[in-house]
From Swiss-Prot:
It catalyses: oxaloacetate + phosphate = phosphoenolpyruvate + hydrogencarbonate. PANTHER family: PHOSPHOENOLPYRUVATE CARBOXYLASE. The active site is at 137, 545. Forms oxaloacetate, a four-carbon dicarboxylic acid source for the tricarboxylic acid cycle. InterPro entries: PEP_COase, PEP_COase_bac/pln-type, PEP_COase_Lys_AS, PEPCASE_His_AS, Pyrv/PenolPyrv_kinase-like_dom. This is Phosphoenolpyruvate carboxylase. PROSITE patterns: PEPCASE_1, PEPCASE_2.
Length: 879
């Protein structure tokens, strides 16, 4: 195992040396020496040397204002380079990739060992559906311009990995690496202005262009090979096991910057980008498909006998169609009113048909090897991305729909919809949904908020079918929340039935989710509308913020289990949409573990999950990483459907109820009921300063003033990650476990840990958080930043963390954290040496900036922002 890490460590050390050379060249020997001294002290302090720890604190406290920024940047940039080396390690032939046999090949072997029939496996492959929803959560701290440089660093590491390089080749690559490290150093790593929703959407398109466009067909090629080798089965050309959707430009929940006009613009931009990428593909096909032999059907399609190169002829027509469509979209984006061309591309079939005709003809004429080249990749892209490139979800909060309809009923003299009972609301909505006349009068001039809701529905109605994937209702609580959206879409003249997904995200809403859906499915009109398909979104982040991570995850499990059983009984195919984040407090977990820990049957309707902020870059930042991420997802979904996890035993459910109640009580006891908690949170973390980071287009708070409940889940997690207490990801969990142990359930817990993936994943996630948390750093933040009257609260929380770690180790029967995942333990240890100085420096900078009466020194502010970005890179997640 150590040989594996030695390759990564030598890359890390090489990149560190290059960064050191750059710093020395830019700022002189004395700054580099200062950075080196701090690094050595940090290493020694991590090894347990108390004197080094004290010296580290003194050194960082005594930095002059002009040393603050270079030191912060040095450690922050080093962590970015470490992450890049680690990402490369995961795909390097000498790293993880070498020791990780193909996830899919392993799975097929295991399935055969379990005596599953090949027919069952093929059916599961045919039904495989994975939809990844890219969201612009403000967690991707790294600027796009730096990401491009880091991607190129990755390419250089890959080039250096060849043993047969000539000296001049190696020198050339090293020279390029030096340039990239220097370019990064001389680039400002902190954005100066917040990205707009359109900027965020462009960031999403860049992920498609730079990674997914290559990565998806490459994964499907590999998947097809595994299927041929294991099952003697080919993936049908028209199969769409992978799809991408985006919330960028569609998610208006709590983000007033996402307007109907923005959504309209992003839809056009997305279609424009699709024409741009497909034109490149078609250009290659025009030059490749020079063959003349074809089937009579294709000859006729191409224009008869006189056409000498029929495939080329068809490709040129597609090229013209793409060019005309692109010109039209460009004019629309500039705000010009133009007539669409007669051959405007609006549906995937328009692209698919001529390409597939060429594919079939080539195969029929014995040219399968050509058909299965670039042409097959393009066909797969048409299926995965198509004319819209990425579909978008529209998300809005339930009260906005209620307010809009209430304003309308008041205007029409029907009374105040908002004050009606749920039964009256449903009766009114169903009556209107069945009515042939419009409800919204032509001359009505609603308020700006209502106008915005109606206009958004019009944008959906005008969009080509297939470019909007779903309408998600956040904070959904009752059946009328879902019916209201269907009515608003009907009033906008929407010509197709759009999936409307309620999002249940607080503890109470999760507990009521099954009841709400049962009522909806009992409405005949509704059953007729949905045609046997229903999507429900499960919120992870807000439920964890509301009740603590243990109670929330049990409520999520129970809600999913109940919904699966209700829909099965009603003959409805249920797609559960998981709104999980990158961090543990927002439901994040390694994909494979997370999927296998869900209730049996939860993936029958396919997987739909959000991929957030910085996790998009870690999982899909490079084509090679995309291939391995998709392979993990595919193998996890197939495994969950073919070898479902066990139904929990009655006793396990009872233990989880004890755990959940006790953990929720403790969590809320601190977070909601302790009057000192909010002042402590504001003082001990950079929560207030985080608002200054121009991260996403979305405000950090739902309401400008107010306590924890008004904070969005992301800044809440982000703040606690910065001071290394990691509180949202564990508070209450250990106390709940201890209560179960005190009730004599220790043996049961050990069995649950061994035999129940749901529970073992929870314990594994707690271990990961504990490995990243740090007691002495959290205490240092208190000493430097918190009023003495609040110190006892901080001490209580740290004592609780220590007790929780012991409980988890006792249940997992380990003597140290992450014993079964040494690779992650190694990765955390490698980073800590560089993250610790950033944490100490951050506490110092917060202290300085809060001491200053007037506006803080620009140097201090800038350095503070760099430490926030650096700690986020060190923790490998933000919020």
């Amino acid at each position: 195992m150590n040989e594996q890490y030695s390759a990564m460590r030598s890359n890390v050390s090489m990149l560190g040396t290059l960064l050191g050379d750059t710093i020395k060249e830019a700022l002189g020997e004395h700054i580099l020496e200062k950075v080196e001294t701090i690094r050595k002290l940090s290493k020694s302090s991590r090894a347990g040397n108390e004197a080094s720890r004290q010296e580290l604190l003194t050194t960082l406290q005594n930095l002059s204002n002009d040393e603050l920024l270079p030191v912060a940047r040095a450690f922050s940039q080093f962590l970015n380079l470490t992450n890049t080396a680690e990402q490369y390690h995961s795909i390097s032939p000498h790293g993880e990739a070498a020791s990780n046999p193909e996830a899919l090949a392993q799975l097929f072997t295991r399935l055969k060992d379990k005596k599953l029939s090949e027919q069952d496996m093929r059916s599961a492959v045919d039904e495989l559906s994975i939809e990844l929803v890219l969201t612009a959560h403000p967690t991707e701290i790294t600027r796009r311009t730096l990401i491009h440089k880091l991607v190129e660093v990755n390419t250089c590491l890959s080039q250096l990995d060849h043993n047969d390089l000539a000296d001049y080749e190696r020198n050339k690559i090293m020279r390029r690496l030096r340039q990239l490290v220097a370019q990064s150093w001389h680039t400002d790593e902190i954005r100066k202005i917040r990205p707009s929703p359109v900027d965020e959407a462009k960031w999403g398109f860049a992920v498609v262009e730079n990674s997914l466009w290559e990565g998806v067909p490459a994964f499907l090629r590999e998947f097809n090979e595994q299927l041929q080798n294991s099952l003697d089965y080919r993936l049908p050309v028209e199969a769409v096991p992978i799809r991408f959707t985006s919330w960028m430009g569609g998610d208006r929940d709590g983000n007033p910057n996402v307007t109907a006009e923005i959504t309209r613009h992003v839809l056009l931009l997305s279609r424009w980008k699709a024409t741009d990428l497909f034109l490149r593909d078609i250009q290659v096909l025009v030059s490749e498909l020079s063959m003349s032999e074809c089937t009579p059907e294709l000859r006729e399609l191409a224009g008869g006998e006189e056409v000498l190169e029929p495939y080329r002829e068809l490709m040129k027509r597609v090229r013209t169609q793409l060019t005309n469509t692109q010109a039209y979209l460009e004019a629309r984006l500039k705000g010009e009113r133009v007539l669409p061309p007669t051959d405007l591309l609006v549906s995937n079939d328009q692209l698919w048909d001529p390409l597939y005709a060429c594919y079939q003809s080539l195969k029929a004429c014995g040219m399968e090897i050509i058909a299965n080249g670039q042409l097959l990749d393009t066909l797969r892209r048409v299926r995965c991305f198509g004319v819209p490139l990425v579909r978008i979800d529209v998300r809005q909060e339930s009260t906005r729909h209620t307010d809009a309809i209430a304003e309308l009923t008041r205007y029409l003299g029907l009374g105040d919809y908002e004050s009606w009972s749920e039964a009256d609301k449903q009766a009114f909505l169903i009556r209107e949904l069945n009515s042939k006349r419009p409800l919204v009068p032509l001359k009505w001039e609603p308020s700006a908020d209502t106008q915005e809701v109606l206009e958004t529905c019009r944008v959906i109605a005008e969009a080509p079918q297939g470019s909007i994937a779903a309408y998600v209702i956040s904070m959904a609580k009752v059946p009328s929340d879902v019916l209201a959206v269907h009515l608003l879409l009907k009033e906008a003249g929407c010509p197709f039935t759009l999936p409307v997904a309620p999002l249940f995200e607080t503890l109470d809403d999760l507990n009521n989710a099954d009841d709400v859906m049962t009522q909806l499915l009992n409405i005949d009109w509704y059953r007729g509308l949905i045609q046997g398909k229903q999507m429900v979104m499960i919120g992870y982040s807000d439920s964890a913020k509301d009740a603590g991570v243990m109670a929330a995850s049990w409520a999520q499990y129970r809600a999913q289990d109940a919904l699966i059983k209700t829909c099965e009984k009603a003959g409805i195919s249920l797609t559960l949409f998981h709104g999980r984040g990158g961090s543990i407090g927002r439901g994040g977990a390694p994909a494979h573990a997370a999927l296998l820990s869900q209730p049996p049957g939860s993936l029958k309707g396919g997987l739909r999950v959000t991929e957030q902020g910085e996790m998009i870059r870690f999982k899909f930042g490079l084509p090679e990483v995309t291939i391995s991420s998709l392979a993990l997802y595919a193998s996890a979904v197939l495994e969950a459907n073919l070898l479902p996890p066990p139904e929990p035993k009655k006793e396990w459910n009872e233990v989880m109820d004890i755990l959940s109640d006790a953990s929720c009580e403790m969590y809320r006891g601190y977070v909601r009921e302790n009057p000192q908690f909010v002042p402590y949170f504001r003082a001990a973390t950079p929560e207030l300063e985080l608002g200054k980071l121009p991260l996403g287009s979305r405000p950090a708070k739902r309401r400008p003033n107010g306590g924890v409940e008004s904070l969005r889940a992301i800044p809440w997690i982000f703040a606690w990650t910065q001071n290394r207490l990691m509180l949202p990801a564990w508070l209450g969990a250990g106390a709940g476990l201890q209560k179960a142990i005190d009730a004599g359930k220790k043996e049961v817990l050990a069995t649950m840990c061994r035999d129940w993936p749901f529970f073992s994943t929870r314990i594994g996630m707690l271990e990961m958080v504990f490995a990243k948390a740090d007691l002495w750093l959290a205490e240092y933040y208190d000493q430097r930043l918190v009023d003495k009257s609040l110190w006892p609260l901080g001490q209580q929380l740290r004592d609780q963390l220590e007790a929780d770690i012991k409980v988890v180790l006792a249940i997992a029967n380990d003597d140290h954290l992450m014993a079964d995942l040494p690779w992650i333990a190694e990765s955390i240890a490698l980073r800590n040496v560089y993250t610790d100085p950033l944490n100490v420096l951050q506490a110092e900078l917060l202290h300085r900036s809060r001491q200053q009466e007037n506006a803080a020194d620009a140097c201090v502010e800038q350095a503070l922002m760099v430490t926030i970005a650096g700690v986020a890179a060190g923790m490998r997640n933000t919020g």
